[in-house]
C-alpha cells in the first residue's frame, strides 16, 4: 500500500510540475510583449492616437485615464502639446513575469527631446504594467507611471 501511495504522489508531482510549466510565460509571449512595448512607444511618438489606444484593452487604464476614447484623447493632446518637437520614448530594463493569459511588466523610460542640440533627456520614470492576452494579442490593461523627479524639483525645471 505504501508503494502505491508513493507512486501516486510521484505521478501527481510529475503531472503537477508539467501543468505548472505549461502555464508559464513562453518565449513567444515574451517576444510579443516586447513588441507591444515597442508599438506603444512608436505610436505615441508618431502621434498615431488610434494605434496608441490599440495597445490597451478596450477598458484599459493609463494613470487616471480609462477606456479607448480617453486614451485616444490623451494621445492627441500629447501630440498637440509637443508643438512640432521631436520627442522619443526610450525604454530599458524591461522585466516581464506571468503566465499564458496575464503578465506584469516593469520598465524604465527616458523621454528624450531631439529638437534640442544636443538632444536632452526631459524626464525619467518607470512604468508598472498589467497585461492580458486577448484574441488580438497582448494588450495593456493598466499602466501606471512613477516619476524619478520629485514634484518640487519638476516644478522648478526650466520650461522648454
Regions found by a protein language model. Give the residues of each.
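Short beta-strand edge/turn micro-motifs at domain boundaries
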Residues: 104, 124-157
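A solvent-exposed, acidic/Ser-Thr-rich amphipathic alpha-helical stretch
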Residues: 49-111
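Short, cysteine-centered beta-strand-loop-beta hairpins and adjacent loop/turn segments enriched
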Residues: 83-84, 112-121, 150-151
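Bacterial N-terminal signal peptides that target proteins for export
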Residues: 1-7
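Short, low-complexity N-terminal intrinsically disordered segments enriched in polar/charged residues
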Residues: 17-46, 50-58, 69
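Exposed loop/turn and edge beta-strand positions of beta-sandwich/beta-sheet ligand-binding modules
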Residues: 90, 121, 125
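Bacterial N-terminal signal peptides
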Residues: 7-16
Amino acid at each position: 500500500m505504501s508503494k502505491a501511495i508513493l507512486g501516486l504522489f510521484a505521478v501527481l508531482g510529475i503531472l503537477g510540475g508539467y501543468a505548472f510549466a505549461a502555464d508559464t510565460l513562453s518565449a513567444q509571449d515574451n517576444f510579443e510583449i516586447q513588441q507591444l512595448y515597442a508599438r506603444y512607444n512608436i505610436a505615441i511618438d508618431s502621434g498615431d492616437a488610434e494605434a496608441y489606444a490599440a495597445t490597451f484593452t478596450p477598458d484599459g487604464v493609463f494613470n487616471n485615464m480609462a477606456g479607448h476614447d480617453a486614451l485616444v484623447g490623451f494621445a492627441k493632446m500629447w501630440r498637440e502639446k509637443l508643438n512640432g518637437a521631436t520627442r522619443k520614448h526610450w525604454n530599458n530594463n524591461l522585466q516581464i513575469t506571468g503566465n499564458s493569459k496575464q503578465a506584469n511588466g516593469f520598465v524604465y523610460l527616458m523621454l528624450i527631446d531631439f529638437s534640442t542640440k544636443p538632444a536632452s533627456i526631459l524626464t525619467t520614470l518607470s512604468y508598472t504594467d498589467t497585461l492580458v492576452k486577448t484574441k488580438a494579442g497582448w494588450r495593456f490593461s493598466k499602466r501606471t507611471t512613477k516619476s524619478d523627479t520629485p514634484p518640487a524639483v519638476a516644478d522648478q525645471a526650466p520650461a522648454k
